[in-house]
Amino acid sequence: MANSASAIKRIELNERNRLRNKTYKSMLKTYYKKCIVAIETTNNNDLETSNLRELVAITQSKIDKAVQKGIIHSNNGSAKKAKLTKRLKEKKISL
């Protein structure tokens, strides 16, 4: 256990940040999974495609924000965005 007051404060701060990052990562995974499911189940009609475009844009924005905040590594964020784009291209859906 930490002896100094600053070390104790740092432990509390680290725990608070860990919990915040955990919730953000969980939200990010949820958006990513929703996006993958939406891509796989789309029928290329106009309404579904527009909703899908919006969902992909939101997901990519959330990934970028997670990278900016240091929650995920930049390479991890780039890989996630590339996988989304690859799945869209396989389904022949343009953004």
Curated annotation (Swiss-Prot):
Main location: plastid
Chain segments carrying region Disordered: 76-95
Sample GO molecular function, one term: small ribosomal subunit rRNA binding
Record has RNA-binding as a keyword: yes
Disulfide bridges in this chain: none
Top-level taxon of the source organism: Eukaryota
GO biological process: translation
NCBIfam families in the record: S20
Family: Belongs to the bacterial ribosomal protein bS20 family.
PANTHER family, sorted: 30S RIBOSOMAL PROTEIN S20, SMALL RIBOSOMAL SUBUNIT PROTEIN BS20C
Annotated protein name in UniProt: Small ribosomal subunit protein bS20c
Species this protein is from: Guillardia theta (Cryptophyte)
Organism lineage string: Eukaryota, Cryptophyceae, Pyrenomonadales, Geminigeraceae, Guillardia
